[in-house]
Amino acid sequence: MVRFGVDLGGTKIELVALDHNGKEVFRKRVPTPKVYQATLTTIVNLVQEAESHLNVIGSVGVGIPGVISPFTGLVKNANSTWINGQPLDKDLSRLLEREVRVANDANCFAVSEATDGAAAGMGLVFGVIIGTGCGGGIANNGKVHGGGNGIGGEWGHNPLPWMNKSEFQSTQCFCGSHDCIETYVSGTGFVRDFNQSTGLELTSGVEIMDLFRQGAEPAKQALERYCDRLARSLAHLINILDPEAIVLGGGMSNIDEIYPQVQQLLNKYVLGGECKTKFLKNQFGCSSGVRGAAWLWAKD
């Protein structure tokens, strides 16, 4: 059996084909058209090209930067705005003449890492994607848990837990709320915190980590604050979901110094003072989402 996964991004649409062992046997990437009908055509053409190349008909899963509303059956909350309000799964199923499964891209990330990635074989896995924003997804026994409202995993838009006096800044999040986790533990939040504490105007976490590795004390303090905030935020997740593993993706996942610090701090913040949940770096990097889309058709 061949599984096709499609990642519908804002600038590119990517397809991969996985064989029955999860080995990649085909990949192609094309620019994303900014029109709904053209997006449908592009996805259909990619699937048909892959099937022609491999001489096989396969299952199709699609990851999107939004969700299918369980109430209306239409896409919502997508930053690729031209797919909002559209019955994407139904339209693709009709055009490809088979059921097409569609899920949030963060959920696809979680499914990928839970199926054959960093958390392979674990039951309940939370996938965390931290870059310019802060998203998440839940895989339960290798399958998406979207929840009754279709927003399962949106941990970044809860308030930062156990805030201290210096953190009560009433920082507004793009979602309209204040002091969301995302405003502190996103890559953007990491840079803003460093700049506010130093008066500098750096533009990326890479610059901060370069200073850290040169022994700069302000960078060391910024990373300590960041890891403490991330550990507090993840501890809330663990207290509620108690996952076997949390897998980190996105740009911040490339900072290797984060993992041991956060793993140790979880013992401080998780109820009971002991945490067995593993905090892991992703295995498949930027390919994890598209692989997870393919794995929406899980192994039987």
PLM feature segments, named:
Residues L74-N84:
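A charged helix-plus-loop insertion that forms the helical arch/lid used to bind
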Residues M1-S59, S69-T72, K90-V100, T115-M122, ...:
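ATP-binding/phosphotransfer module of carbohydrate and carboxylate kinases, centering on a glycine-rich
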Residues A120-I181:
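Glycine-rich phosphate-binding loop of actin/hexokinase-like ATP-binding domains
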Residues P31-K34, I83, I151-E154:
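A short acidic/small-residue loop/turn micro-motif
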Residues E24, V75, V144-H145:
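Hydrophobic "anchor" residues
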Residues V102-A106:
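Short loop/edge segments at beta-strand edges and connector loops
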Residues R27-R29, A78, G147:
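Residue-level detector of high-confidence beta-strand sites
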